[in-house]
Each structure stands twice: as structure tokens, then as C-alpha cells.
Amino acid sequence: MLHSNIYSLQTEATNKILSTSSLEELESLRLYYFGKSGVITACLRSISTINNIEERKSIGSAVNSICAELKSLMNSQKEKLHKIQIDAQLMEDKIDISLPVRPKQIAKLHPISKTLHEVKHIFVSLGFKLSDGPELEDEFHVFDALNTHKHHPAREENDTFYLKKLVNNKRIVLRTHTSSVQIRTMESNNGNYPIKIIAPGKVYRNDWDATHSPMFHQIEGLYIDKNINMGHLKYCINYFLKKFFGENIQIRFRNSYFPFTEPSAEVDIKCSQKNWMEILGCGMVHHNVLTNVNINPEQYSGFAFGIGIERIAMIKYNINDLRKFYSNKLQWLTHHGFCFTNLIT
């Protein structure tokens, strides 16, 4: 009786397994037949009640074979239903290839980085070499060696950032200009001429408004050799300004005063029909400065100049507030930034 029942149970289970249409339905069938209280599980338990050993072996072998076939069929049906489920989901989630892709955000070069690169490129084409120095400096390299006396307004604490702690009994400042690099270069020159350098870098002054920042970028230049005169300086400055702003730019030199140059000049460019704008300071290196770094002013002369990078960037790219350079606003940088392909190489 059990023998005939198990085969009819196989036929019934096979038909039900093949007719399932979902993984959930198939799992319910598995529990119905093979769970702890399942129909086939009960048949397996009842085998032990058969007294005839040969009959018990025959029925046990048949039940085990049927169990293996049904479980194999369930696994095959499970794979089939799983594939159908995935295909249906893919059809539901298909991508509309007619839709435009999201635009890629391309990195932009900051206007200050662009300006620094361009200025350095122009002066390197004139034979200047790049030179660098520390941003934390002692007073000698920032002021004393540059002929700036102890009572000069630039040395007051409301204009300059001083460190509270002395180093080797010297007051340390955040450099107010990269002229300190010029001093260090002349000190370590060891009689090798000409000295022809530009010193780009960050400088610090205690000021903050639409046209001033407590930290800004500067490039200073220095050219020391025999028989260097004001004509060399004017040619160099004119060449730079025409390359940077365009050949049609109008330039004028005005007498001025700086403690580290004599004669000194400020250079203006014409921004409209009536208005001139100061763009940089320059002059012939003062004899006292040369003497302070053990260069004989009777044999050697030279010129120096200083350019504020933010200032010329504001003029060239029509930016009216210096503070926007450091605002970190992505919208502003996207508008005023430059593609890397625009770099001069």
C-alpha cells in the first residue's frame, strides 16, 4: 500500500512543481513535501514500521530515489523561476537610451593659478630663474637688509604679523613680501653673476577689505650684474605688461619712494580714457641693500620689481572683489575658472 502511495505522490508533486509560477509558491511546496511535518517526510518515518526487511529495503530505496528526483526537479524549477524574475525586473528597469547623459563636471583652474603660471612663463622667457624661500622670516631678511629702518610704519604690529616666540633672540614675522628671497639669493651667490631671479609666493599683511587680503600672492624680480641701468628695467617691465595685458596697453612710469630702491618708480596702466591704475612698484636696487649682502655697489648694480598677482588678475579678468578669490564658491570658480588647455606651455 505504501509502495503505490509513494509513486502517486511523486506524480502529484511533479505536476505541482512544474506548474509553479513564483519562487514563493515553490518554497511553499518544498515545505509541504519536505518540511518537518511534510508529506514525504511522514512517508520516510513510516518505513521503520514495516516488519518485512526485504519490503522495507525496497520501499526505502524507492522513497529515497523519489526524494532525490523531486529535490532535483525543485532546484531546476527554482533556477528557471529565478531567471524569469530577473528578466522581468530588467524589462521593468530598462534604461531609456534616448535620454541625454548627465553632464560631467570638468575641473577648472583657479584665476590665481592661471595668472601665476602666465607671469612665470613670461619672465622665464626673458631668462629669469625661479627662486623660493621661507614664509616665516627673521626681521633682518624682511626689513633690515632691505634698508627699512626700525621705525618704518611697515614694521608696526598693526601692519605685520609677528610671532610671539623669539627664535635665537630674533623676532620672526610672516614675510610681507618675497623680497626676502632676493636677500637670501644675493647672500648665497658666492660671486656668480648675473643674478636674475623671480620669487613667486605667498605674503602676509594685516589688512582685509575688497582690495586687500591678509594673505596674497606676489612675484618679485631681481637682476644684478655690471652696468645694469634704468633702461634695462623699463624694457623688462614694458615687455611683461604688453605680453600679459596685450600689445596696445598704455604704460607710464611715475617717480616714487621705496627704502630698498633708488631711484624708485610706480608703474601705471591706462584702464579707460581718463583713468590710470597703479600696477606694480620697481626701481634700481639701493646701494645699502647691496652692501648689506656683501655686493660691491661700485662694481655691480641691478633692478628689482614687485607684482601683486591678485591685483593684475582682478584687472585682466574683471573681478571687482579680491575676497572672492578665497570664497570657495563652486559657482564663482566655474564662471571665472579656466580650462587646463588654456595654459601657456
From Swiss-Prot:
Reaction it catalyzes: tRNA(Phe) + L-phenylalanine + ATP = L-phenylalanyl-tRNA(Phe) + AMP + diphosphate + H(+)
InterPro entries membership: aa-tRNA-synth_II, aa-tRNA-synth_II/BPL/LPL, Phe-tRNA-synth_IIc_asu, Phe-tRNA_ligase_II_N, Phe_tRNA_ligase_alpha1_bac, Phenylalanyl-tRNA_Synthase, tRNA-bd_arm
Cofactor requirement: Mg(2+)
GO annotation, cellular component aspect: cytoplasm
One GO MF term: phenylalanine-tRNA ligase activity
Annotated localization: Cytoplasm
SUPFAM superfamilies with a match to the protein in the record: Class II aaRS and biotin synthetases, tRNA-binding arm
Keyword Cytoplasm attached: yes
Main location: cytoplasm
The UniProt record lists the keyword Nucleotide-binding: yes
UniProt keyword list: Aminoacyl-tRNA synthetase, ATP-binding, Cytoplasm, Ligase, Magnesium, Metal-binding, Nucleotide-binding, Protein biosynthesis
Domain of life the protein comes from: Bacteria
Residues where Mg(2+) binds: E262
EC number from the UniProt entry: 6.1.1.20
One Pfam family of this chain: tRNA-synt_2d
Family named by the database record: Belongs to the class-II aminoacyl-tRNA synthetase family. Phe-tRNA synthetase alpha subunit type 1 subfamily.
PANTHER family (alphabetical): PHENYLALANINE--TRNA LIGASE, MITOCHONDRIAL, PHENYLALANYL-TRNA SYNTHETASE
Protein name in the entry: Phenylalanine--tRNA ligase alpha subunit
